[in-house]
Amino acid sequence: MKTLSMKHRVGIVWLQNELRTDDNPLLCKAAAECQQLIVLYCANPKWFDANRYGLRSIGERRWRFIWESLTNLDALLQQLGQQLLVLPQSPLHAIAELITAHNVDALYYAEHPGVYERTYAELLKRRYPLLQHHAVCSQSLWEQQQLPFTLADLPDSFSKFRRQLEQNDLRDAIPAPLSSPRQLPPPPAGLLAVPRQPLPVVTAPQHPQFVGGSHAAYEQVQAYFASGAASTYKETRNALDSWSDSTKFSAWLADGSLSVRRLHQQLLNYEQQQGANESTYWIFFELMWREYFHWYGRRHGRSLFAFNGIRQQRPQTSFYAGRWQQWCSGTTPFPIVNACMNQLNATGYLSNRGRQLVASCFVHELQLDWRYGAAFFEQQLIDYDVSSNWGNWQYLAGVGADPRGHRRFDLDKQTRQYDPNGDFIARWHGKVEATLDWVDAADWPIHPPK
């Protein structure tokens, strides 16, 4: 029973990449402090408009996955006495209207690694200085104050980052995941009765395995660890086209329907029951990569999207519309790249090895501006994560967190190693008649797949 002694009268929990009730510190904090609560998600119309690269921030497959996660979250919230309010507005407009209509006095949101998400939060602070703003850590393994360095002193490579964490035994210091609140404060009267604009239509077919939401995330985590595949992960992780050869947790981590701390707890449980080995460590190793890019995004802000990256060194690449179109549509002279791009366009997913190969081709063989590749991934990938995506593209373009810089993959060698019988190329129709097309900009604009 909520009483008048509670800290806030009406609070807004502004969800972004925390689409869960389990281990959600935003909901837990608001539940303890508010008499009434609005649980808000903003489907920003800008996501669905063409950006500077002629692409959308969210493609059809990722929007379907997010929509499924939102639907599942609403069902979970209803079990706790709440409902999810999804508005097709920018956070500034949506939150402003709710503050006025419901006398909101507290706002809860995540400490997000994305510079644009943080900009919205800063603008809200300036516009509503009397509002109590609660920025909460919800997307990382560690709290910022636990790191053995300041954000300004974030190591300039993953190897240095990992060594500092391991030298300080910080794995044992990862906070335990929180349980879901048993009950949430009710929404203000009349909140859901106001007519709203419709959300963007879901047009992509449902993926047979990547289904959004905490329920599907839980099933994938349980199935993966029950299969024993974690004990051989290091040997299988570079396969191009098998569901069980890698964890596939990334999509649910990306929209926050799966907590990274909950996942880490499940990994620890597996190690205690089945034994830790190099493969189970490598799963944690991948979580540390994700963690590094989380803080990398927080540290470097807008430089994450800059052509010269964080190293102030301009790449010797440009933009060629014909090559760009070939890469997007999987019609380059490189069959392994074509197969990967066809898989990405058809499913919204691509293996880690596949991502490295197509990015290397984009930068080296095709000599294209890496930002266009990163933007295409942003549109197409179901598991898009702002810091990991743009940070990894910088890494491969030689303008990011790679001391060796400008890494290039030998596509013929990679094909022999990872597709020796040509099964992957055949399955995804990688062999096409294509040559590099030296065209001028007259054929622009080109519309890549959605």
Q: Where are the regions that the model predicts?
A:
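Soluble or luminal CAZymes and related metallo-dependent hydrolases
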Residues: F65, S69, G213-A216, T332, ...
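Alpha-helical packing segments of well-folded alpha/beta enzyme cores
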Residues: L26, S69, L73, A217-Y224, ...
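Trp/Phe/Arg-rich N-terminal binding region typifying the photolyase-homology
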Residues: K2-A173, N342, S388, N392
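Active-site-proximal binding-pocket segments
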Residues: D245-D437
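Glycine/tryptophan-enriched, flexible segments
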Residues: T150-A306, T415-K450
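Intrinsically disordered, low-complexity boundary segments flanking structured domains
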Residues: M1, L27-K29, T71-L73, L123, ...
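Charge-dense, low-complexity intrinsically disordered segments
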Residues: R56-R64, P208-H215, W327, T415
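Residues within alpha-helical segments
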Residues: A31, H215-Y218, M341, A374
